[in-house]
From Swiss-Prot:
PANTHER family in the cross-refs: PERMEASE COMPONENT OF TUNGSTATE ABC TRANSPORTER
CDD domains: TM_PBP2
Membrane-spanning intervals of the chain: 45-65, 76-96, 114-134, 168-188, 212-232
Residue intervals of the ABC transmembrane type-1 domain: 37-233
Quaternary structure, from the entry: The complex is composed of two ATP-binding proteins (TupC), two transmembrane proteins (TupB) and a solute-binding protein (TupA).
Keyword annotations from UniProtKB, A to Z: Cell inner membrane, Cell membrane, Membrane, Transmembrane, Transmembrane helix, Transport
Similarity remark: Belongs to the binding-protein-dependent transport system permease family.
Pfam families xref list: BPD_transp_1
GO molecular function: ABC-type tungstate transporter activity
Main localization of the protein described in the UniProt heading: membrane
Protein name: Tungstate uptake system permease protein TupB
Localisation: Cell inner membrane
Amino acid sequence: MLKLLILKRIFLDYIFDGFKQALFLLFNADESVISAIKTTLLSSSISIVLALLIGFPLGFILGFFEFKLKRFIKLIVDTSLSFPTVAVGLILYALISSRGPLGEFGLLFTIKALILGQFILALPIVIALFSNLIENMNKKHFLLIKSFHLSPLKLVLTMIYELRFALISVVALAYGRIVAEVGVAMIVGGNIKYDTRTITTAISLETNKGEFASGIALALVLILIAFCLNFITHKLKRT
């Protein structure tokens, strides 16, 4: 019993010291921690914007129109939602490495590769969820919008506006996935300090090195991002 209490005390002290050092690193703006945060926010923000710009029109086409290969394409899109991020990273690595078809562009281990990988992860989520929203839209509401004989662009924008509250959740889900992923960022980004190191890859590295405080500091930031994302989502839905 005494041994158990001692082990419990040691564990709690270890956790407490880790949190204390983590807060010290955050409040003192540790350079490596801030760099990982900046890289994460920059790459994820650009990739989610690109995914929305391309995903909304493609999702609209998939949900609005009827064509021969629709079921097959939906199957591919839905399958890609659960595709392992490590596998995506490996495929992308093969494409952009020096021996790959896109090797001449020198994308490997750059912020551009990081953005491309996150974009590939976010795009199927946007397409799949938006197409489902279009298909499940109230038929009377749908026919009313269609009766206005709008141009294709205006029709897409009108649909987006009408489904804006549901789309907030789509954006939050897609953004949450790319911010929290490790596989693609590690493989094609290379986890280079002050360049392509993200919050998640930094947590993995620091924990493996035994730098528990740095890992906790970055984990706290990741939790804060998730909290802010959900807070903004709930606020927008109420407006």
